[in-house]
Regions:
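Zinc-dependent deaminase catalytic domain
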Residues: 1-136
Length: 136
């Protein structure tokens, strides 16, 4: 989890710094991601400070991790995901399930305000797809 926190610090988002790390069966880091803009997109302070604009450009840490693994030809099947800041949203949960991540660890000290509906759907999908999750 500490490595995921460090990766989150790479985000240029002044208000939210989320990090994600996928770990293989031998403890090796397979991929990492943080909330930020896509490759080649200017991540200017103005875009981050205008929330409606930011939300159009931002890639969640979990999505970024999946894209980075794909870009580098790394399979995440059977891996473990560590994510900081917030629980996995329902959009990211679909990607987590689809690439074969089997375990998800999230921080227990987060503010669920505004995220409860999305998290409830994520939890439901994780249970149905037999993805283990835990707040640590």
């Amino acid at each position: 989890m500490e490595i995921a926190k460090a990766v989150g610090e790479w985000s240029k988002d002044p208000s939210t710094k989320i990090g994600a790390v996928a770990v293989g069966s031998k403890g090796q880091i397979l991929a990492q991601g943080y909330n930020g803009f896509a490759r080649g997109i200017l991540d200017t302070e103005e875009r981050y400070n205008d929330r409606p604009t930011k939300y159009k450009y931002i890639v969640h840490a979990e999505q970024n991790l999946i894209y980075n693994a794909t870009y580098n030809g790394v399979s995440l099947d059977g891996s473990t995901l560590y994510v900081t800041g917030l629980p996995v949203c329902s959009e990211c949960a679909k990607g987590v399930i689809q690439v074969g991540i089997r375990r998800v660890y999230m921080p227990k000290d987060f503010d669920i305000k505004g995220w409860s509906e999305s998290w409830e759907l994520s939890a439901s999908m994780f249970k149905e797809a037999d993805v283990y999750y835990e707040f640590i």
